[in-house]
Amino acid sequence: MEEDQELERKMSGVKTSMAEGERKTALEMVQAAGTDRHCVTFVLHEEDHTLGNSLRYMIMKNPEVEFCGYTTTHPSESKINLRIQTRGALPAVEPFQRGLTDLMNVCQHVLDKFEASIKEYKDQKASRNEATF
């Protein structure tokens, strides 16, 4: 029971988002009857293969994860089902959260490198323009 409450506390920060003045669920956590917290399906609304495959890759890098896969429910629906199964005592929500954090860090690194390259290009272009005068 305490583990379930702890799991709910961890998930409470990412469950909902505000859309057009009303509360809309962005993420659902689904457990099949008879399963434990080590095998969970996360339903991510308004997402597609872009996040699904990237997140699956980041989660599978965790050696405690036995299985991670995702499916799109239907081409006309914007949601994915991401299933995580872990080994040992690690609840599935932890690699999910770590995968999101790791993916955000990778995206931030790519953005930083991209912006630095743009700045370097503009600086080089400006110095070439000054040299021609």
Swiss-Prot record:
Subcellular location: Nucleus
UniProt region (Disordered), positions on chain: 1-22
Major site of localization recorded for this protein: nucleus
PROSITE patterns assigned to the protein according to its UniProt record, in alphabetical order: RNA_POL_L_13KD
Pfam families per the UniProt record, alphabetical: RNA_pol_L_2 (PF13656)
Top-rank taxon, per record: Eukaryota
Protein name per Swiss-Prot or TrEMBL: DNA-directed RNA polymerases I and III subunit RPAC2
